[in-house]
Regions:
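Exported/periplasmic ABC-transporter solute-binding proteins
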Residues: 17-55, 111, 119-301
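Sec-dependent bacterial lipoprotein signal peptides
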Residues: 1-14
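Conserved catalytic motifs of the protein kinase core domain
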Residues: 9, 114, 251
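Short, glycine-/small- and polar/acidic-enriched structural segments
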Residues: 105-108, 113-115
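Early extracytoplasmic/lumenal segment of secretory-pathway proteins
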Residues: 16-106, 286
Length: 301
């Protein structure tokens, strides 16, 4: 019985020691803890960035809260979590919320994402114009094509509602599901539907989706006459994202309202650093800026 009591006391003391060590980690740009709200469209690239960051800085601990834009933004504005990944900047009213607390939001673009339009691989029609997409969103299309989005509160759907200048979806022709994976599955199994999914999500290595992705293809998109990308149909490959020629582009931002020089600031700087931008480049997205490369040319004479 005494031995059991000794073991119990030992583990209690050990847990207290570990907790004390965790609590004593200094809060700096490369150590401590931070919570980050992440738009689910960009969860893959943020997970990659955090993994590499933590491999360099062992005392950095991240808690990510992933959700659609409408879900995570209220949490950010009520001061529960002060770092957020979004596909847009704060509105003037949202910006004032933090400024009223004497905190100036720091916003940094670190990547360029494209929004892919997907159709079944055996669909003969693999191209579409921006005008056609807008007509579907307005409910005036006569082509029979239909759009499927991840969910009713996503940043992707907001993007297209703003594009078409509508506040409500038509009763027919535009539908929302529950997730990006649901969109890919649905399009792979149903003809005449066009799935709308962010490039970062589409190219993420998700083994559960391999068989479904094999049954779909990305559509080429031609922009409105007079705009860049109106001369041909372009797909959302990395070159077209970087050149800005693919019509459906969106920036990816980290917005930091920590109000101090902590891990949130360090991670924001990391995303903009050559190392962070290289991870963006390898992910298939467009980096904020192209990194120059130095070559050592040896004289062999």
């Amino acid at each position: 019985m005494k031995n059991l009591s000794f073991v119990f006391i030992f583990f209690v003391l050990l847990s207290c020691k570990n907790k004390k060590q965790a609590d004593s980690v200094e809060q700096t740009r490369t150590s401590g803890t931070v919570k980050i709200l992440v738009d689910e469209s960009f969860s893959s690239i943020i997970a990659d960035q955090i993994m590499v960051f933590k491999s360099d800085y062992k005392n950095a601990e991240f808690t990510t809260i992933v959700g659609n834009e409408n879900k995570i933004l209220p949490t950010f504005l009520n001061d529960s979590v002060r770092v957020i990944i979004l596909s847009r900047m704060l509105t003037p009213d949202e910006d004032k919320v933090y400024r009223s607390r004497s905190i100036v939001p720091k916003t940094s673009r670190f990547a360029i994402d494209g929004i892919s339009l997907l159709t079944q691989k055996d669909d003969l029609d693999s191209n579409i114009t921006v005008e056609e997409v807008i007509s579907i969103l307005k409910g005036t299309s006569t082509t029979g094509k239909q759009l499927v989005f991840d969910n009713a509160y996503s940043s992707t759907l907001r993007y297209f509602k703003e594009l078409a200048q509508i506040t409500e979806l038509p009763k027919r022709g535009v539908y929302t599901l529950q997730s990006n994976n649901d969109v890919i599955k649905y399009v792979s199994e149903n003809k005449n539907f066009i799935g709308v999914v962010g490039v970062n999500w589409l190219i993420a290595n998700n083994p559960d989706m391999t068989s479904y992705i094999a049954k779909v293809k990305t559509m080429g998109v031609k922009d409105i006459k007079g705009k860049k990308g109106s001369d041909a149909y372009y797909r959302p490959d990395q070159t077209n994202l970087i050149n800005g020629i693919y019509p459906f582009l969106r920036n990816v931002y980290i917005i930091n309202c920590e109000g101090r020089d902590g891990l949130g600031t360090g991670f924001a700087n990391w995303l903009m650093s050559p190392r962070g931008q290289l991870i963006v480049l390898k992910s298939g997205l467009g980096p904020h800026k192209m990194m120059s490369r130095d070559f050592n040319l040896k004289n062999t004479n």
